[in-house]
From Swiss-Prot:
Essential cofactor(s): Mg(2+)
List of residues binding Mg(2+): 173, 259, 261-262
Binding site for S-adenosyl-L-homocysteine: 18, 61, 66, 98-99, 134-135
Protein name: Probable caffeine synthase 5
Record EC number: 2.1.1.-
UniProt organism field: Camellia sinensis (Tea plant)
Keywords per UniProt: Magnesium, Metal-binding, Methyltransferase, Transferase
Amino acid sequence: MEVKEALFMNRGEGENSYAQNSSFTQKVASMTMPVLENAVETLFSKDFHLLQALNVVDLGCATSPNTFTVISTIKRMMEKKCRELNCQTLELQVYLNDLPGNDFNTLFKGLLSKVVVGNKCEEVSCYVMGVPGSFHGRLFPRNSLRLVHSCYSAHWLSQAPKGLTSREGLALNRRKIYISKTSPLVVREAYLSQFHEDFTMFLNARSQEVVPNGCMVLILPGRQSSNPSSMESCFTWELLAIAIGELVSQGLIDEDKLDTFNVPSYFPSLEEVKDIVERDGSFTIDHMVGFELDTPQMQENDKWVRVEKLAKAVRAFTEPIISNQFGHEIMDKLYDKFTYIVVSDLEGKIPKTTSIVLVLSKIIG
């Protein structure tokens, strides 16, 4: 099965769903709202007299309440600018994008209960539609978007990195599912190469879709360290690999399935992201910063409660692609193992996560 068919967050609204276990990305989105507000204000300052409608896309929207916050923030800022500039009523067209496997039903069910859609009596009329497809390619007509937003999505790769088997067909990243301290250099290079290729495709597609002077607000999980095997970027996948390895030892998973599985994700450094944007040359970097955050689970004093909540959050975004490789029937055992490993080996300590915030403007010309 291709990545685009297996990569999505846990569906529905149950106890293991992404909708119920996305508090960390909600925290990140909340902290970066001032950046989005400033981006909307900047759009009006550039060419507000030309605006009749603002076309916006949220790429990789999943089913998180983040999407509702993004729409409400943009709508509120548009209403504010309309009052300040005494301009005509504007329309807000929002496209919600994710891969076809995303639970758009749950997304729109929540959206209709939280965001006023299509109300002509408001200063800004809001219209929303879903756009399934991969953001690594074109999704919209040329020069049709003024604002692109994406939170914790652009780090996902279009496929597992190429070149992770030897000439003899042997796995080069044995007993691991991502970069680790024991991974050979070729694994690190393969992951960076795949991210470079995919993020370049992402930028190229958006450069055709975004109008001149339009902008993008991108938030990615990343790392402060230059070392891609640092714990801040490898924590989740490293411990899941250990948990899967224990299930292999118990005969519940075939070892070959572990050795041949590599997660299609990459946590870049700020320097790597900056280098790719500058090499592409379609956008200027208006703002770029990295910041660290504790996970919300760290607020829990009891380490078992803390880690059990962490395991649910991890399960919400990893289970679909993990179960596609290893089978649905062992998922409960796997995440129980994950919980036990974090508590027993790390005493419930969870490293901080680095987020990269990037504001890009489309170059005129």
